Design a protein with these regions (language model features):
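A conserved beta-strand-loop-helix scaffold within acyl/acetyltransferase catalytic domains
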Residues: 1-22, 69-210, 223
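Aromatic (often tryptophan-rich) hydrophobic motifs at membrane interfaces
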Residues: 2, 14, 38, 42, ...
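Active-site/acyl-donor-binding loops of N-acyltransferases
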Residues: 15-18, 79-101, 228-309
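A gly/proline- and charged-residue-enriched helix-loop-helix capping module
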Residues: 27-74
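Mobile, glycine- and charge-enriched loop segments
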Residues: 31, 188, 195-197, 290-294
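Short catalytic-loop micro-motif centered on adjacent basic/acidic residues
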Residues: 66, 125, 232-236
Length: 309
């Protein structure tokens, strides 16, 4: 969605999801796809432009809009529409700091893992031609399965191919290898204008867990980013924005945290209430499952009944 007043611009990227004939809703793609405004836009432009965008969405048949705000780019985003809800914290590495300072801020357990991997001969390289992409996909899927991740964190092969084709040089695949075998890998996206490297997906081979390859990959990535002029390596947060072990793992590389928030806007209240019939919902309280009509209705099994397997 693009809105302009002739001088400044607002861009709201989203994925369109069909509901019924003529009705649909909007959601951010995987990751942090919040709205963007022109660099020189005054503070009041964003809210006015977003109001105009919401009106355009309503006229186009949109029922609701769910946006994942970028913890860095949308840190000062203010909107009077819907609800902006804090979901958790994310972690980033300040790449403008000298390497000695970055190493000093690295937790001792991570330093130990990185040094052990080095002594064992683990090497990290940038796979510029994505020759190891298939191996990375397998490792990533195995990692998500071990973590009991939901379907949201799994992607088909076309998704990866689209990343490679569409992002080109703005996508990095770094792999950790021991004796020429890929034991871990990570994908990073690059936003050169904003100076942000985004840690996108990563995985490691369970048989080589003692090498802790993800640690040396992130360490190498932040050095690459620093040497190539990037200002931040955004590592993200835990699964589902939780303060879990994944979040703590990322905190081991940097003390810098940022608020991750979502924005929920009901575009068409009448259609929203009609679609949400049978579910506990209110257009005044949007802090629960949103949009409410997409929440699965639990199946109630009468006492003493048996489910067929």
């Amino acid at each position: 969605m693009h809105v302009t007043n002739g001088t400044h611009e607002l861009l709201v990227p989203f994925v369109r999801r069909e509901i019924t004939e003529g009705l649909w809703d909007a959601t951010s793609a995987y990751g942090y796809g919040g709205p963007l405004t022109s660099t020189s836009a005054p503070p009041d432009f964003a809210d006015a432009a977003f109001r105009a965008a919401v009106q355009m969405l309503r006229e186009a048949g949109c029922v609701a809009c769910f946006l994942r705000l970028h913890p860095l780019l949308n840190a000062h985003w203010k909107s009077s529409l819907g609800l902006v809800l804090k979901q958790g914290l994310t972690v980033s590495v300040d790449l403008t700091k000298p390497p000695e300072k970055l190493w000093q801020e690295t937790q001792s357990r991570h330093k130990l893992g990185i040094n052990r991997a080095r002594r064992a001969g683990v090497m990290v390289r940038l796979d510029k031609n994505f020759e190891t992409l298939s191996r990375f996909i397998d490792i990533y899927n195995q990692t998500m399965t071990r973590r009991c991740a939901t379907d949201y964190y799994f992607f088909d092969k076309q998704y990866y191919r689209s990343l490679v084709d569409d992002l080109g040089d703005d996508l990095l695949l770094m792999v950790a290898e021991e004796a020429d075998k890929v034991i871990g890998g990570a994908l990073f996206t690059l936003a050169r204008r904003s100076g942000i490297m985004q840690y996108h997906l990563s995985g490691s081979d369970w048989d080589y867990r003692h090498r802790q390859p993800t640690k040396i990959i992130i360490h190498t990535a932040r050095e690459w980013g620093r040497m190539n002029g990037f200002s931040r390596l955004h590592l993200g947060g835990g699964l589902g924005s939780a303060a879990d072990s994944l979040h703590e793992f990322k905190r081991g590389f940097s003390p810098d945290t940022h608020v991750f928030a979502t924005q929920r806007v009901v575009i068409n209240p009448e259609a929203y209430r009609a679609l949400s019939e049978g579910r506990s919902t209110s257009t005044d309280d949007l802090s629960g499952y949103f949009p409410a009509y997409r929440q699965p209705i639990p199946v109630r099994v009468p006492a003493g009944s048996r489910l067929a397997v």
